[in-house]
């Protein structure tokens, strides 16, 4: 496929609008409502906060805040119908709260708790993932994974193939496979249809912490972020034993990934930057947002693929407009038709098109050699 270019520096800065919902306390996770313009965040204090936002402008207003736990609320996940939000945290408890049909309307039910499972895990829960309406996955600091049916009081299966924290989950519906990444350097695949408490497969040791995962290429492949700043590409048709490609270049750990298109991902890194990268062929496209020197904890894309939500240690939830991030194909066609004839004009055009599209000139200089070896 042809390279997908970001808009030029001036246009990018003008069109990438940032709106901050300050939490005053360190946030750990971010989640978007699947049907409404509402964004949620879990906080160090055990709170879960909700903000409504304008679909067009991104302007936010606080909707509600609850504190279901006195200990850190680490992880959030929302059911596909948008009715309930699940929270896991340092206490090891698993909580479920209502997200009313119109969260922007304050009522006594805003954030009200519907279910609580004390001591769901023996140690802190690090990740929660709603697979579907009747299945929720949780992973803790010891590498234990549990599957839950909301209609039942206890977990339905427990997996212990990992020996370090569970960092992320993703799900492939065609094969009913839940994939988990871990700080022990392995990823594992669980067939949710199986009644056995053993995984379908466990990968080879990648000799690095695996921190994040997201499907790409229409679910044919997956890409995983690591502690050393390397992206690994996994081909499902070739199995999950080992990755098929590696993309070096990030100067710090890749703690979060989202897919913007089937071929384009955004990564949140320990150095505070959110980068956009094209995969197969590999190309670094630019930096679209930054949390300065604070590490990016999580990033999510909203239901319209317009707003990219990110949280960091800078005590704010940031919304970045990524809807018009890439040049329109019509613009590319016009540029090809108006291709300059002289070598001098071609040279000028090449310099203009290949410039790094970072949020500042300094960032562009720092990242100029990024992915230079690809």
Swiss-Prot record:
Listed Pfam families: WDR55 (PF24796)
Show the InterPro entries listed in the entry: WD40/YVTN_repeat-like_dom_sf, WD40_repeat_dom_sf, WD40_rpt, WDR55, WDR55_POC1
- Region ranges (Disordered): 325-374
Q: Which GO terms describe its cellular component?
A: nucleolus
Q: Does the keyword Transmembrane helix apply?
A: no
Q: Which segments carry the WD repeats? A: 21-61, 68-107, 120-158, 161-200, 205-244, 249-287, 290-330
Where, per UniProt, does this protein localize?
Answer: Nucleus, Nucleolus
Q: Does the keyword field hold NAD?
A: no
Q: What is its main location?
A: nucleus
Here the segments flagged for biased composition (Acidic residues) are 325-344
Name the UniProt key words of this record, in alphabetical order. Answer: Nucleus, Repeat, WD repeat
Q: Which domain of life is it from?
A: Eukaryota
SMART domains assigned: WD40 (SM00320)
Q: Which family does it belong to?
A: Belongs to the WD repeat WDR55 family.
What protein name applies here? WD repeat-containing protein JIP5
| UniProt organism field | Cryptococcus neoformans var. neoformans serotype D (strain B-3501A)
Specify the taxonomic lineage: Eukaryota, Fungi, Dikarya, Basidiomycota, Agaricomycotina
Task: List the gene name.
Answer: JIP5
